[in-house]
Regions:
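GST-like domain detector, emphasizing the conserved glutathione-binding G-site
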Residues: 1-77
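Non-transmembrane alpha-helical segments in soluble domains
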Residues: 7, 11, 29-32, 111-114, ...
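Surface-exposed cleft-lining segments at the edges of enzyme active sites
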Residues: 14, 18-19, 95-106
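A structural motif
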Residues: 68-96, 108-115
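Alpha-helical packing segments of well-folded alpha/beta enzyme cores
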Residues: 99-102, 106-120, 142, 163
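Surface-exposed helix-capping loop/turn segments at secondary-structure junctions
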Residues: 119-130, 169
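GST superfamily/GST-like fold recognition
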Residues: 127-147
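Long, positively charged, glycine-interspersed low-complexity recognition regions
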Residues: 143-169
């Protein structure tokens, strides 16, 4: 997760205020990996509801160039995101946009995650505790994008809706 790597670097360089509580570093990593697995769902909804397909459509040449680029590894491990990226862009090209089945699956991916946050926010003001963390920042982006796509965040998840409104001020 590049953004997590950047935050980790900034956290080491500028330790105050802390965005990754030391006592929860492993938990943060696991939760951000979960958030990262939903990235393609967020992209599908963004491309379906915000961005006209013609603007983001990739040509065969662009797809071939992307496929050939890079080492195929991240931190010495196979880059499993690349195959997902290629499949996403090929589907976009084949269907001239995000297919209905992909959109439906993406919509269904988020309620359980927000339900987990609903439980956490019943016990504390932020996702990890009493202060803002990198997890709040990551999920703010998702909540903002999904709200813009018409997801009824405050209706389905009132605590998450209140948390979002507080961060959105």
């Amino acid at each position: 997760i590049e953004s997590y790597d950047i935050i980790t670097y900034l956290e080491a360089k500028f330790p105050s205020p802390t965005l990754i509580p030391e006592s929860q570093r492993d938990k943060v990593g696991a939760l951000l990996n979960f958030e990262d697995r939903l990235h393609m769902d967020l992209r599908a909804l963004t491309m379906r509801f915000f961005v006209p397909a013609a603007i983001v459509q990739r040509s065969d040449a662009q797809l071939a160039q992307y496929h050939a680029a890079g080492s195929g590894q991240v931190r010495g491990s196979a880059d499993d995101h690349k195959a997902d990226e290629m499949a996403f862009w090929r589907d976009m090209k084949e269907h001239n946009g995000v297919p209905e089945t992909r959109t439906k699956a993406a919509v269904e991916a988020f309620p359980a995650a927000f339900d987990d946050h609903e439980v956490a926010l019943a016990m504390r003001p932020y996702l990890l505790g009493e202060t803002l963390s990198v997890l709040d920042i990551a999920w703010y982006v998702y909540a903002n994008r999904l709200r813009g796509a018409g997801y009824p965040l405050a209706h389905l998840h009132p605590r998450v809706g209140a948390w979002f409104a507080k961060l959105d001020q």
